Amino acid sequence: MFARLPVVFLYAFVAFGALVAALPGGHPGTTTPPVTTTVTVTTPPSTTTIAAGGTCTTGSLSCCNQVQSASSSPVTALLGLLGIVLSDLNVLVGISCSPLTVIGVGGSGCSAQTVCCENTQFNGLINIGCTPINIL
C-alpha cells in the first residue's frame, strides 16, 4: 500500500502543474491594442443670424479667447488630440470659450472675441461653426 504512495504524489504533482498553467493571470501571448474613438462633426455653412442686441438665433453666444479657422495648425492639432474630425475645414473654431448670458452681454462681459457658435464640444474648450459678432 505504501509503495503506491509516491505514484499518487507524482500524479497529483503533474495534475497540479497542469492546473496552474491553465489558470488565468499568467503572461498572455498577445496583447489587445487600445480602442480609438473618433468623433466626426459635420457643420453646415454658417447660417447663424444675429438679432438686435447681440443674441444668437441658431446657436449659443460665447466669449472665446481665440477664434481661428479649422484649417489652422493649432486648431488641427487640438482637434486631432481630442479625436474630432471635421468634414469642412472652412469653418471658424472658437478655443477656450465660455457662454455669455443676457446679463453678461454688456460692455465688460467679454474681454476677448464674442461669437455665436453652433456646436460646443468639451465644455467650451472647442466651439465649432462660430460667427464673430460685435456687441454694441
UniProtKB/Swiss-Prot annotation:
Disulfide bonds join C56-C63, C64-C97, C110-C116, C117-C130. It is found in: Secreted; Secreted, Cell wall. Its main location: secreted. Thin and stable coatings of SC3 hydrophobin onto polymeric substrates have potential utility of hydrophobin coatings for personal care or biomedical applications requiring lubricious, low-friction surfaces. SC3 has also potential anti-tumor activity with cytotoxic activity towards melanoma cells at a high SC3 concentration but no direct effect towards sarcoma cells. Disruption phenotype: Leads to a wettable phenotype with hydrophilic aerial hyphae. Reduces the surface tension, therefore decreasing the formation of aerial hyphae and primordia. Affects the composition of the cell wall with an increase of the amount of mucilage (i.e., water-soluble (1-3)beta-glucan with single glucose residues attached by (1-6)beta-linkages), and a decrease of the amount of alkali-resistant glucan (linked to chitin). GO terms for molecular function: structural constituent of cell wall. The protein contains 20 mannose residues. Keywords: Cell wall, Disulfide bond, Fruiting body, Secreted, Signal. Induction: Expression is regulated by the mating-type genes in the secondary mycelium, and especially repressed by the MATB-controlled pathway. One of its GO terms (cellular component) is extracellular region. Residues 1-24 form the signal peptide. Belongs to the fungal hydrophobin family. This is Class I hydrophobin SC3. It comes from Schizophyllum commune. The gene is SC3.
